[in-house]
């Protein structure tokens, strides 16, 4: 039996959360994770360069037949866990139901606050500042048919400071929460999958 869970990371942009996983892997902190594949929904996503530099198989899939091609790739590479890391496409309920408790997303707020339809990227941080909350953070959760509605795996809080702009807050949430939380959550789920194999 394999002592690794094979992981695919789905990206649409610069790949900062992908890089956090790559860095933790290189540091030996993810002993049950094999990063087998990076898939981008955008041709020029910076995350593809990060995968290239790390020697990880990477591919761009265009809009046409995206999910069918993705499913074929995941099966070909025997993927156990799918990680959404700055991935901006909405996956269909048919796709999500194929991989119960195997798709992981990181969201830049403490769910159930500032989540769901329309809350992504900078908009999440704008909403937190507009509302006047004193604490925000990040959540890693399983993906189900409800946007940001799956079971929570881990959360980390981040203080909001006087003078924060959405951009400053976004950066702090990434550095203090997302980049720490996501790799640890992927390792946790991977270890559970390996343990279930016996």
Predicted feature descriptions by range:
Residues 1-198:
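One-carbon transfer enzymes
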């Amino acid at each position: 039996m394999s002592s690794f869970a094979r992981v695919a990371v789905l990206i649409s942009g610069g790949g900062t959360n992908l890089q956090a996983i790559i860095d933790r892997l290189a540091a030996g902190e993810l002993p049950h994770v094999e990063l087998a594949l990076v898939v981008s929904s955008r041709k020029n996503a910076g995350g593809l360069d990060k995968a290239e530099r790390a020697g990880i198989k990477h591919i761009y899939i265009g809009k046409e037949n995206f999910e069918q091609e993705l499913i074929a790739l995941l099966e070909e590479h025997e993927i156990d866990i799918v990680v959404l890391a700055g991935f901006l496409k909405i996956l269909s309920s048919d796709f999500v139901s194929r991989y119960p408790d195997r798709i992981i997303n990181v969201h830049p707020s403490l769910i159930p606050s500032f989540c769901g339809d329309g809350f992504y990227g900078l908009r999440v941080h704008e909403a937190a500042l507009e509302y006047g909350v004193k604490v925000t953070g990040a959540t890693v959760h399983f993906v189900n048919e409800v946007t940001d509605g799956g079971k929570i795996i881990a959360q980390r809080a981040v203080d909001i400071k006087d003078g924060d702009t959405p951009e400053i807050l976004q950066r702090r949430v990434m550095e203090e929460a997302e980049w720490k939380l996501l790799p640890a959550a992927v390792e946790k789920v991977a270890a559970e999958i390996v343990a279930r194999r016996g």
